[in-house]
């Protein structure tokens, strides 16, 4: 990373964009508790959700900032992580001109969003050990490469990328390095959040859908420099996170001990499932995991997938993904769910 300047990456139209100003944005610095709001054409009769939500989700950001040791100005919230990722494309990638890089096998939405935004998507395969091939990645970079996506722990492989490889990419690439940490809470490795101030080109995405158990409310999180977050705030929809989502997130975030207990239970169930998988006759390889799932190579993925479906067990068949021929991905369930899976595996062995 040499002479990094965010202004060299922001799309020209976004630089001059005047963002939409919602009714509530104009009063964000006032004590609104006793104010009468007749500005947004809302239904005035109280039912808990008759008013528009806070467009900046200030209460949620304050809690997240305290938990992570950051400033609220380093946080953007979205309607799931996919919205956050889409905003990165729209803020920094010029259609038909720019490109991004991802490292298959990995989360498929990077490529989908690139196609939606008409941005070239370059794929540099991971190594056989599912680590970034740093030299190949950097060789693929052009002056129009805006983002490199690193999913760590990676989906579907479950492993984290080495600190050395990520650091090299951060230091040698003058675009944004987006580290997708959807599964970081299941890993013993530290988050890259502590490095935000060191690397202005570092962006981190997280979610409440995995360890926090709130997939149904759709809340994704982007952490970055205040300058990055300011750009994303310019282009985000004004009320992209609804009131019910904000309320439910606050309730959950204030109960960290329960979250920690659930994570501990999931990891314990992961270890129990690993022991059973080691005894299944058709399992050929079990890949190391730091997530709430296990990637397993079997003799015939399509056959074993169909057999489990018949027994009422739904898993993910990843055999069509690069480097994942005949691989199945098992999400870690409750103890009861895992017992059903374990019994089914024994029955089809």
Give the residues covered by each predicted segment.
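N-terminal "arm"/small-domain region of PLP-dependent enzymes with the aminotransferase-like
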Residues: 1-66
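Phosphate-binding glycine-rich loop
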Residues: 59-99, 117
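Conserved PLP-anchoring active-site segment centered on the Schiff-base-forming lysine
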Residues: 91-113, 127
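Short beta->alpha connector loops at strand-helix junctions that form conserved
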Residues: 104, 120-128, 318-319
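Active-site pre-lysine segment of PLP-dependent enzymes
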Residues: 115, 134-143, 156-177, 181-214
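PLP-dependent enzyme catalytic core of the Aspartate aminotransferase-like
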Residues: 164, 310-311, 321-349
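PLP-dependent aminotransferase class I/II
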Residues: 201-279, 286
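Conserved PLP-binding catalytic core of the aspartate aminotransferase-like
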Residues: 266-267, 279-311
